[in-house]
């Protein structure tokens, strides 16, 4: 999936943030089958960028194109189909349902990725298999983060958006998660855009941008 930004500026964003950014108000292309790291301090627009790419925010100027098509021309139904089949995201706030079990949250995905390992295999790799039948509200934030990651990886995608996916993981669990992500990116022939506050995970990135 090819993503192009042509002088995109979200509202509202301070002028000094825009001027110092590698992304805002520039011409930028996230190429197919590439891995991009977006690094910045809090409040610089990392989550905003991923929300724009996922189509849940449309308050911006400039042109955002997906595979050559202006995103402003996409209908609600177009976006639903894109999210169902082509783009997967792990939100910074995870967006899990606390009253459901970890497995029930994962199984909310309407279409499974035929290239992905089974849920139990991914959960075992991330060390959360024993928690799958617990309510999310009984899990630690690090455990919840891994549940949300499995949910993002279990659906089909050509583009994977990860918003600070390791913020509550120790080095060992971050390494396990990075390995799983790398494997799924390769199997899917997909692109990755990952945001971080500064730490660089064990993933080979083709481009690094500063907001």
Model-assigned labels for residue ranges:
Residues 116-131:
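Conserved ABC ATPase "signature" region
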Residues 135-139, 143-145:
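Conserved ABC ATPase signature
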Residues 93, 99-112:
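Q-loop/switch helix immediately C-terminal to the Walker
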Residues 160-164:
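Catalytic Walker B motif of ABC-type/P-loop ATPase nucleotide-binding domains
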Residues 54:
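Helix-to-loop junction immediately C-terminal to a conserved catalytic motif
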